[in-house]
Design a protein with these regions (language model features):
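Conformationally flexible catalytic loops at phosphate/diphosphate-handling active centers
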Residues: 113-200
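Thiamine diphosphate
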Residues: 1-78, 84-107
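Flexible glycine/proline-enriched surface loops and loop-helix/loop-strand junctions
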Residues: 82-83, 177
Length: 200
């Protein structure tokens, strides 16, 4: 059953997303500029653990010498080094379509994604679009991939060790072990887009 939780602050939301993902939940969040920056430590963990997730970002200017609520990509680019894949939308229709593509691709690739769009114009725009139907969404999500995600969840029935402190040799080996997932991702995203074109 889908649920929605609201955190008292952005930092708590980041930790809640990470925790929910560790339990095998299909979890997403919606963020903009300053809130995204508060999530960066958790984003490194999520990407490092190869956990499927999608963060929908209304991209806005970061506050520097002054606050600005208008759109640019400075917030998204600040989070670029976290290991998240990045998909951009240029219209309301694309925002809907890319959102579904991102959710399907993250399950296949095990790479989390930032799906971002203009945080002032696109996020406030009202427009007629071709709305995705529940059957279309269902067809895009592979049940086997959802099951695999849930089997990687933390459970007393399947104990695993996570969040350890490691010496440089072991840490380096573990970091290199995730490279095949990143190397496969550029092929998975176009395949997911092709599937979307066939389904919708």
């Amino acid at each position: 059953v889908p649920g929605r939780e609201r955190s008292s602050d952005q930092l708590g939301a980041a930790a809640a997303v990470h925790g929910a993902l560790q339990t095998g939940s299909l979890t997403t969040t919606f963020k903009a500029s300053q809130g995204l920056l508060l999530m960066i430590p958790s984003m490194f963990k999520i990407a490092g653990e190869l956990t499927p997730a999608v963060f929908h970002i209304s991209a806005r200017t970061l506050a520097t010498h002054a606050l600005s609520i208008f759109g640019d990509h400075s917030d998204v680019m600040s989070a670029r080094s976290t290991g998240f894949g990045m998909l951009a939308s240029g219209s309301v229709q694309e925002a809907q379509d890319m959102a579904l593509i991102a959710h399907a691709a993250t399950l296949a690739a095990r790479i989390p994604f930032m799906h971002y769009f203009d945080g002032f114009r696109t996020s406030h725009e009202e427009n007629k679009i071709e709305v995705l139907q529940p059957a279309d969404m269902r067809a895009m999500i592979d049940d086997q991939l959802v099951f695999a995600h849930r089997m990687r969840a933390m459970s007393p029935d399947r104990p695993v060790l996570r969040g350890t402190a490691q010496n440089p040799d072991v840490f380096f080996t573990a970091r290199e072990a995730c490279n095949p997932f990143y190397e496969a991702c550029p092929a998975i995203v176009p395949q997911t887009m092709d599937k979307f074109a066939a389904v919708v």
